[in-house]
Amino acid sequence: MAEKRVVITGMGVVGPVGNNSYDFWDGIRHEKNGIGQITHFDTAGHKACMGAEVKDFVFPDKRAAKRLDLSSQYAIVAVREAMADSGLKAGENVDPYRFGVIGGTGIGGIMTLEAETKKAIERGVSRVSPLMVTMTIPNMIAGNISIETGAKGIS
């Protein structure tokens, strides 16, 4: 069987230890702990109140952020960094039809789903965002990355 290689061309990170590759690796090297009190939702009534949340994150495009769940925002920022690090640009130095995106999530979009469900209960279903479905389906992270990068290959 022929030996196959995996080549890392660029890196991007958004995580509890750093929101870019440099800060992430610096945090790992200095044994920074990304675990702390959960702040993204009320933990009252839950057994767990600690987690590894992303901190100090601001999506650079406020208008686009309204259409994207936080999970997609994290992914897009990490992909932008990885693409810049690699020097790859779909349509310029990479054939977009040979450039695909594979990604996944266990429950990406859950924060939007929870917020919109609460809105429906408290204010009525007419107040639910028409973008809720596109913000909560799990494959939208890969879809949003494809849109961001121009990837049109197998995904």
Protein language model regions, located:
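Conserved "HGTGT" condensation-loop signature of ketosynthase/thiolase-family condensing enzymes
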Residues: 1-154
